[in-house]
């Protein structure tokens, strides 16, 4: 039963004021990527720059072309501006673990447009051999976080997953499934393939 002693009017008024201040649009919600572990005394920006510079020297032992240096500086500046350093460091760490343990892996997709990903060993597409368009991968205007696809050899994927669980903890890492729906045409085509029926039939 309501009474003013239990629920003073001034407190009720204040709760209404608080609720008004809690109104927001879902458009305002932004995912904040967790900070990655970095060596003591370094910031995530410093560490990403150090790893990229080290990879640059490995990829081009006799020195990279001028445009590659410019491209890397452009990419690192945008990565810093959009606060994506931790994401790159996480993917680098996982790929580095795989390579040190002779687990086959390959970065693919729009990340191949990144000279930084090439220097970090995430992708294997030499940016001097293609006309890279970094903005296909990360763009200030698109305002979407980067998405680096990395494939690992099927037989040893479990080792990668266990490494991630050990490093980040099971409360901070999870498997995510992508579910697709078959359309009639593609379903019939795949059934035909499985039954070795020619598509023309």
Language-model regions: role of each:
Residues 1-201:
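Phosphodiester-processing cores and adjacent nucleic acid-binding clamps
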């Amino acid at each position: 039963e309501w009474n003013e002693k239990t629920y003073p009017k001034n407190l009720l008024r204040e709760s209404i004021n608080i609720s008004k201040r809690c109104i927001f649009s879902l458009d305002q919600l932004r995912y904040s990527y967790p900070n990655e572990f970095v060596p003591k005394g370094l910031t995530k920006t410093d560490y990403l720059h150090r790893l990229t510079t080290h990879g640059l020297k490995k990829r081009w032992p006799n020195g990279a072309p001028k445009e590659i240096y410019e491209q890397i500086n452009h990419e690192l500046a945008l990565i810093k501006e959009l606060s994506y350093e931790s994401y790159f460091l996480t993917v680098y760490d996982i790929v580095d673990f795989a390579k040190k343990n002779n687990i086959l892996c390959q970065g693919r997709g729009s990340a191949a447009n990144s000279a930084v990903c090439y220097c970090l060993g995430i992708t294997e597409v030499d940016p001097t051999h293609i006309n890279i368009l970094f903005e296909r991968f990360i763009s200030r205007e698109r305002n979407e976080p980067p998405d680096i696809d990395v494939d690992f050899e099927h037989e040893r994927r479990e080792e990668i997953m266990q490494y991630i669980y050990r490093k980040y903890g099971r409360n901070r890492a999870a498997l995510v499934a992508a579910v697709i729906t078959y359309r009639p045409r593609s379903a019939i085509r795949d059934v035909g393939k499985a039954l070795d029926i020619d598509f023309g039939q």
